[in-house]
């Protein structure tokens, strides 16, 4: 959309753009839930007066999940009062039934326990906004406690093999999404410590990527400027893989990471630490696990989960989600919304105890 919007405005392309201004043209737009809500879409529509627009998305913007803009995907792709703006619906359940994507296995790990809380507070309800509001609980210091972060990093380090090396055969890759850059830096350092302490054959190749503000100030109490952290991560990456990326070659760094997650003839990245990048629109069949220490809702949740469920080798039987926050209600709400008010459990494997009982009986 950026290229077309620029072409419409740039005098250099005026002759070409004007030639199509009054012609019947069709724009086919992928990932239309996230790219068409700004000014650029309007500028393009204004120029091409007779154009039609067809958008594809796995996670439309509905009334329930619309943003501050107030519009839905149907509003942006309005087809007139007599027509349904949605031409066709192909739900996740259809894709699963057709064998085009996999179901999800979701595992929740409790990381905040009663010993860290005031008397009478139930740790199992801490991620419920209403419960926290009623009991005046601020989750932020609990989530970002250094001891908790170290514990989660250790849990991932110790159990990563079982997630990405199913049946002792093929090896897959993983994302670890956290809530902000400062948290990412803490996890990155914890993984470095764990690697330093581990035998060579047990070490994990951990990389990190995030967008940063070039003119960032330090008023938020950050321990390290985000650009300095990114530069440090890139230097470690260069040492690990024999590359030479710098801040001003960020896009090449991003592309190299993508190739390694996809296992494209390069030594792979085992775990990629992210905040928002790679959680939408990135497809890598060898990626089978998403670790989460981040609250996600609606389309952001489904998009993030869907990084893991692309069909690959026979040993990849489902996409794995390991969440260190209790986002089950948000998960169920999102899966219900994007299934046309269906059953969210259609997309999920049962828990471990269910399959044990099935086997016993």
What are the residue ranges of the model-derived segments?
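Conserved RecA-like ASCE ATPase "motif II neighborhood" in helicase/translocase motors
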Residues: 1-29, 34-43, 253, 274-276
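Long, hydrophobic alpha-helical segments
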Residues: 312-361
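Conserved C-terminal RecA-like helicase domain
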Residues: 136-274
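Short basic/glycine-enriched coil/helix segment immediately N-terminal to the Walker B
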Residues: 7-25, 48, 249-269, 284
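Interdomain helical connector at the RecA1-RecA2 junction of SF1/SF2 helicase-like NTPases
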Residues: 66-171, 188-203
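A short beta-strand element within the Helicase C-terminal
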Residues: 273-274, 278-295, 300-303, 319-323
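Conserved Walker B
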Residues: 31-33, 278, 295, 308
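Conserved helicase ATPase motor motifs in RecA-like P-loop NTPase domains
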Residues: 31-35, 47-66, 99
């Amino acid at each position: 959309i950026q290229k077309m919007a620029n072409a419409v405005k740039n005098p250099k392309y005026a002759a070409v753009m004007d030639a199509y201004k009054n012609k019947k043209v069709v724009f086919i737009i992928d990932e239309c839930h996230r790219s068409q809500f700004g000014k650029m879409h309007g500028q393009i529509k204004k120029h091409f007066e007779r154009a039609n627009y067809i958008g594809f998305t796995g996670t439309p913007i509905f009334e329930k999940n619309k943003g501050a803009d107030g519009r839905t995907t149907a509003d942006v792709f309005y087809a007139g009062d007599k027509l349904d703006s949605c031409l066709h619906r192909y739900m996740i359940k259809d894709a699963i039934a057709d064998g085009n994507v996999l179901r999800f296995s979701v595992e929740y790990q409790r990381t905040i326990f009663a010993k860290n809380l005031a008397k009478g507070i139930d740790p199992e309800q801490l991620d419920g906004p209403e419960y926290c509001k009623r009991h005046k609980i601020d989750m932020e210091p609990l989530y970002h406690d250094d001891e908790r972060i170290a514990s989660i990093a250790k849990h991932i380090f110790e159990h990563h093999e079982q997630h990405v090396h199913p049946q002792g055969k093929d090896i897959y890759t993983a994302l670890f999404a956290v809530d902000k850059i400062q948290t990412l830096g803490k996890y990155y350092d914890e993984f470095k410590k764990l690697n330093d302490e581990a035998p060579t054959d047990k070490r994990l190749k951990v990389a990190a990527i995030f967008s940063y503000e070039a003119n960032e100030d330090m008023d938020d109490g950050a321990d390290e400027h985000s650009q300095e952290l990114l530069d440090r991560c890139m230097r470690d990456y260069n040492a690990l893989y024999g590359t030479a990326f710098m801040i001003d070659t960020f896009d090449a760094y991003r592309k190299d990471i993508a190739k390694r997650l996809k296992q494209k003839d390069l030594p792979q990245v085992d775990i990629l630490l992210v905040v928002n990048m790679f959680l939408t629109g990135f497809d890598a069949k060898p990626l089978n696990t998403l670790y989460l220490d981040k609250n996600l809702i609606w389309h952001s949740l489904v998009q993030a989960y869907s990084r893991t469920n692309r069909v690959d080798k026979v040993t990849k039987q489902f996409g794995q989600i390991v969440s260190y926050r209790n986002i089950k209600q948000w998960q169920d709400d999102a899966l219900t919304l994007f299934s046309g008010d269906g059953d969210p459990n259609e997309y999920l494997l049962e828990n471990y105890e269910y399959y044990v009982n099935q086997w016993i009986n």
